[in-house]
Amino acid sequence: MKLFIILGALNAMMAVGTGAFGAHGLQGKISDHYLSVWEKATTYQMYHGLALLIIGVISGTTSINVNWAGWLIFAGIIFFSGSLYILVLTQIKVLGTITPIGGVLFIIGWIMLIIATFKFAG
């Protein structure tokens, strides 16, 4: 599905941008702890952006579970990385409670991809 390729490319691109912003724009302006949180958000966004690219490539040849995997991983990026970015910029700690929702969405997305693989392989 072209949409997942676009979403994957956009997320990978944004991860490069947020990584550069963290390294050059935030360093020295926030604590090392928050800089580490920012880096984790960037890393997970990149990994899962690449996953969306792969899902986009294979989604036309497999089951609906691949599409579910893509949407769950995309939502995971928003909840996980998005909440961490906002947490770092605002330092509103309650936003950290949203982050695990993104982690769970990532995990379910990966499980759906595994299920799709078994269904496709027969």
Curated annotation (Swiss-Prot):
GO terms for cellular component: plasma membrane. It is found in: Cell membrane. The chain crosses the membrane at residues 3-23, 46-66, 69-89, 98-118. It is a multi-pass membrane protein. The keyword Cell membrane applies. InterPro entries: DUF423 (IPR006696). The keyword tRNA processing does not apply. It holds the Pfam family DUF423. Belongs to the UPF0382 family. This is UPF0382 membrane protein SAB0533.
